[in-house]
Swiss-Prot record:
This is Uncharacterized protein C14F5.02. It comes from the Eukaryota. PANTHER family: TRAFFICKING PROTEIN PARTICLE COMPLEX II-SPECIFIC SUBUNIT 65. GO terms for cellular component: cytosol; nucleus; trans-Golgi network; TRAPPII protein complex. Coiled coil: none annotated. It comes from Schizosaccharomyces pombe (strain 972 / ATCC 24843). It is found in: Cytoplasm; Nucleus. One of its GO terms (biological process) is intra-Golgi vesicle-mediated transport. Residues 148-162 have a biased composition (Basic and acidic residues).
Amino acid sequence: MRNLNTELDFFVSFSALKEENISQLKVYWAQSNLVELYYGESFYINIVCSRPIVDENVTTWPENEGFRIEGTLLESLVESVTSASNYPKVNAFSLMCSGIPSFIWVEDDKQYALWACLAQLDSYSYPNHKLEIHVYKHILPDLPQSSEVDRNSETEGTREENSNTSDWDEQNEYVSEVEGDYNLLGSLSNDIQFRSNPPVISGAYVFGESDVANELKDPSRKTKTRKKVFECSVPVVLKLRSYALNESNQYITSIVSPDSSCENIRILGFKAETNAATISLFAPKTPEKLQITLSSSDVFTIIHLLQIPDNIKHIELQCFCKVIVAQKLSETLVESMPFTYKHPPVLITRRTPTKTHTKQLSSSGNVSAAQSISSLNLLEISASSPSYVPSGSSFSVRANLYNPLDFSIDLLIRIPLYCYDDCLTNKEHSTSKSEEKSSELLKYPNGHTISPGIIALSTKLYTGSIFPKCEKDFDLHFLAYKPGSYDLSSISIEDVNHVVHKPRKLSKELQIIVT
């Protein structure tokens, strides 16, 4: 164990330092850079300061001596910025700690006084930030003598005392014999005595090796300070994908994986909420007790079905992922307390055929029908699909559209709802493969309905704007219903701004065999 009287450091744990576990101080020290401290809105941390006891009576400890503790959040605007003064600073907490010590620690015939303080982190919204904690020895005359938490966050730039990293006086009797004479222990305090529940974090946690500031001497101030900076980030990577089945229904796919800073995460639950739509879980079927463990290379997918009302164009989606982070400590996998990662709201827009404006090439006039036909002919299109598909399964046709023109183009892909077996329909209905019949239920001459073999999950797909010299990929989803041979060449593409032209085929050869 490193000597408490020679080095200042932070300890991060998930239990408060109490009388019954004071003997485990070595464990707190050993885990200082291996266990993360998660925090968020109205979240409490337990801070313990330490200094050696030298020929003093603890019961008559001077009341005018103690510690001032300040936590500051810093946003990193530019990666190359190294000076802390270039960061916008926001006060996270500020408190004083003085009076009789909370605990006494004895090691190698030396005694150390420990002061336990409770600090509350204010809410914040920095996406990329650091947590910087300063501990000042001695209460300055112009500071309030209070141990209450200052919960009113303010811009750190307006407080000169925070931007000045004060130092210690070599003549001070408690400092002259040792290089550093106090420590800061930070612990997650969510037990009953602190009345704090596991936090819903706004996207951050403290972790890893930290920067210990160099000591700076200022003869005008009889204080000593040590500073340490922790990186803050999200331990969970969450990616969202949306696929529109039709104008009212969309699949929302959530892909969850551990952050690069984590070795393992365990997903305990996942919930998605919207403000004006109906969302239901599609897969997996039993989300209540997932208990999915992911390593750094693993991903887990959750799919929701989103139903958007007809009068709503945009909705907000918010996801909550309940997670436990597990790290290796001395060859043992140590789990943290469960916490909930709250993903920032995502705006989802429905696809709608309301784009009826006229695209203009220049101020000279509108795009003519001939130009529109030419633009479709110049459009580079490719499509691919599996040759064999088992019945009862779903499959997709991948379409790639490249716009070589000097202006954007908005397209609509039309897909027949039903496709029929070529052999059967060629015998009985010579026109069954026409565009007029491909999306309708066909019947035998005696009135019996012919069962379709392939059913499309959506009959329309709007591409949105494909910008000049850009390409887009789209997946068209189908259900293989009945064995047979099927032709999907009736899939067509239209320019939504100019409906006078003849649609273009997606591909002339899209043959699917359902086994």
